[in-house]
């Protein structure tokens, strides 16, 4: 693959990330509306529902299996039919002798692919769930803008993790970006707390802590997913991967849902009216689509680029808070956001050698299924 091809892949990844940013801010607004207003304050169930819905990605595979079984049954039926002439039998015999071998090889390859994907999905479903649960729960205590901004610190967690795994190079400029971002975050959190007279400072502390926990979890599964794909040369089938993440989430976390209901920490109940049901389903659809785009963008770009893209959720989240909550932002709040923007430019700076290294790596062969 030439450098032009690489640029095209990268551009496609960036465009997908742009869609993801819009979708994620929209999902944050919907979740915030459900949780903070107590219209449907069920962060665990919402997370469980959103991620379990990924199982629907296996529908095409299930349909192909059904069609394959039907075709196989039809072929076995046809083989039992009487053959009227020796000539027709001799023409058909080679097909019969070659079919089992070919089918066996294809089946072996397919089984290996499914097992690798299932292993990867099982490994990441817990990280995925915990990170999303923390991010959703944070919206019960803080604003969309604060949650989104704090979640964007995953870029810095990603930098350290990716550097330790050899996926990313470390530089003084990127380290400077970390400190600039930290200063901006402090300004933003302080101003967010001052704006909310009706909510205690401890609630904001809980919300901000959960947002940071979600940020750390996000950076861990993003970096490790890219590492697993790159280091082992896996050809990731995104639909199958997400599908099994949904299946494992559904199977592993339903006991916790029951425990939360029994202990009254989060009672299980369906939405009480159409409006809430609509918001819940819309949020689920947004996550369903956007996380597919996110996976594709991760493969086409890099963990750091994907996490840096969260920067652009900040102005959108601020606008969402302005529209939904009639929030106001002090000059210090805006300055904090500017600091974070500057820090991401520093962290995302790449030299020519890094670009050439990526070119060489991609030319070795694609890892993305068409």
Curated annotation (Swiss-Prot):
Annotated transmembrane regions: 11-31, 43-63, 120-140, 147-167, 170-190, 204-224, 240-260, 274-294, 304-324, 327-347
Organism for this UniProt entry: Saccharomyces cerevisiae (strain ATCC 204508 / S288c) (Baker's yeast)
Protein name: Thiamine-repressible mitochondrial transport protein THI74
Domain of life: Eukaryota
Assigned keywords, A-Z: Membrane, Mitochondrion, Transmembrane, Transmembrane helix
Compartments where located: Mitochondrion membrane
Ranges per topology, Mitochondrial intermembrane: 32-42, 141-146, 191-203, 261-273, 325-326
Gene name linked to the record: THI74
Stated induction or repression of this protein's expression: Repressed by thiamine.
Residue ranges constituting the EamA domain according to the UniProt record: 129-190
Recorded topology in the membrane: Multi-pass membrane protein
GO cellular component, one term: fungal-type vacuole
